């Protein structure tokens, strides 16, 4: 089930990120031979990596015994784009705001932000059941996305928080069934920011990153907020691409982090760390069906081949691919990131299986 769900997600993502490489096809980067950290994990990465352009890889393996890191050309301090794994942090913000009474899960987004006639609730936004399309469907919006992808630039950079809310108001709302939506996740984050009277990046820092000690993680929102030497990645065809900061769409995929910080995040979820501000189960536990999986607040849960389950989210930008997967029963998690758009989903699942067998 999990591989079917991942195949659907990968196919949908490919329609966006592969556009950036269809015109120019330089020689693709090759996988680094520079092993870092734990030699066994570095060898797992080298052995299990799939096809596609590869450059650097890094992994964190979390078990009850602690955290191990390994990489090829990157280590636990290397800054990366985590893409849609950001959505799980936005969902955690929702759970916290709901627990504190600022919002209710069943509140329509329109109760807290100007989204016109859009009727979806905050819970529906967090579970991709709001009826919003994956991306804004206006001709101008679609054209700007296509041009950015062909240029290898951030396709979301021109859309502010106000634009995101406008796009929700203008959208033709579909049925309230599961349909993955970047627009929906962005609307959720910007609506919560309105309700809390903060910018999204500040709200994320105050409610999630600082409490968990994720000091190397941020949502810069604009290219101007990045240092000049901020790392960037490569398309699936090996073309250098710009960083994604995503502006108003930051709640859907704009976070930059490190393997060390993402290991802290996974540990907090596996151990029900009070610093989360809510029980981990409030976001992780499945609530609805989701294309062969089940979905909680931002998190997918799928059956594993050994009869257990995997709770996960993946992420992809024009230049990075990410997988964060957890075996909650064994208290094991794996974070994997590569600085190309070639998927690391299967790599992450294989590493989780290896780690689970050793735990």
Where are each of the predicted segments found?
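Catalytic loop of the DD-peptidase/beta-lactamase superfamily, centered on the K-T-G motif
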Residues: 1-70, 77, 81, 193, ...
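Helix N-cap/coil-helix junction residues
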Residues: 54, 102-103, 198, 214
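Active-site SXXK
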Residues: 59, 65, 80-106, 188-193, ...
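Glycine/charged-rich beta-loop-alpha catalytic/anionic-binding loops adjacent to active sites
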Residues: 70-78, 167-174
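Short, glycine/proline-biased beta-turn/loop segments that scaffold the active-site neighborhood
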Residues: 104-118
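Short, surface-exposed loop or secondary-structure junction motifs
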Residues: 120-318
């Amino acid at each position: 089930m999990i591989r079917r769900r991942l195949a659907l997600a990968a196919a949908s993502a490919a329609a966006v990120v592969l556009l950036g490489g269809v015109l120019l096809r330089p020689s693709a980067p090759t996988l680094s031979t520079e092993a870092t950290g734990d030699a066994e994990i570095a060898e797992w990465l080298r052995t299990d990596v799939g096809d596609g352009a590869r450059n650097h890889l890094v992994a964190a393996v979390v078990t009850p015994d602690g955290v191990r890191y390994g990489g090829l050309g990157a280590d636990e301090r290397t800054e990366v784009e985590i893409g849609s794994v950001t959505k799980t942090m936005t969902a955690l913000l929702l759970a916290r705001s709901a627990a504190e009474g600022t919002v209710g899960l069943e509140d329509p987004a329109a109760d807290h932000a100007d989204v016109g006639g859009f009727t979806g609730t905050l819970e529906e936004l967090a579970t991709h059941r709001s009826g919003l399309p994956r991306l804004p469907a206006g001709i101008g919006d679609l054209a700007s996305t296509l041009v950015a992808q062909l240029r290898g630039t951030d396709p979301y950079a021109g859309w502010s928080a106000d634009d995101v809310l406008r796009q929700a108001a203008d959208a033709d709302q579909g049925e309230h069934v599961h349909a993955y939506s970047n627009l929906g996740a962005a609307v959720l984050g910007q609506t919560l920011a309105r309700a809390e009277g903060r910018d999204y990046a500040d709200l994320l820092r105050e409610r999630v990153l600082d409490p968990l000690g994720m000091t190397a993680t941020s949502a810069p929102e604009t290219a101007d907020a990045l240092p000049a030497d901020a790392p960037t990645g490569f398309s699936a065809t090996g073309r250098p691409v710009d960083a994604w900061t995503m502006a108003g769409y930051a709640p859907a995929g704009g976070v930059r982090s490190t393997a060390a910080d993402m290991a802290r995040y996974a540990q907090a979820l596996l151990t029900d760390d009070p610093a989360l501000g809510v029980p981990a189960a409030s976001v992780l536990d499945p609530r609805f069906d989701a294309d062969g999986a089940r979905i909680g607040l931002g998190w997918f849960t799928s059956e594993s081949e050994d009869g257990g389950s995997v709770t996960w989210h993946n992420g992809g930008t024009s230049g990075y691919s990410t997988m964060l997967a957890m075996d909650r029963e064994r208290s094991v998690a794996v974070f994997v990131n590569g600085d190309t758009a070639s998927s690391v989903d299967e790599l992450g699942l294989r590493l989780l299986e290896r780690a689970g067998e050793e735990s």
